[in-house]
From Swiss-Prot:
Belongs to the PetL family. It holds the Pfam family PetL. The gene is petL. The lineage of its organism: Eukaryota, Viridiplantae, Streptophyta, Embryophyta, Tracheophyta. It is a single-pass membrane protein. This is Cytochrome b6-f complex subunit 6. GO terms for molecular function: electron transporter, transferring electrons within cytochrome b6/f complex of photosystem II activity.
Length: 31
């Protein structure tokens, strides 16, 4: 159970980081 929770947390963090980076690049291109 702990492994599944840890994996899910890692996946969520990776998705959030990717989304933040994507938004950041879009803002840079808009400027």
């Amino acid at each position: 159970m702990l492994t599944i929770t840890s994996y899910f947390g890692f996946l969520l963090a990776a998705l959030t980081l990717t989304l933040a980076l994507f938004i950041g690049l879009n803002k840079i291109r808009l400027i």
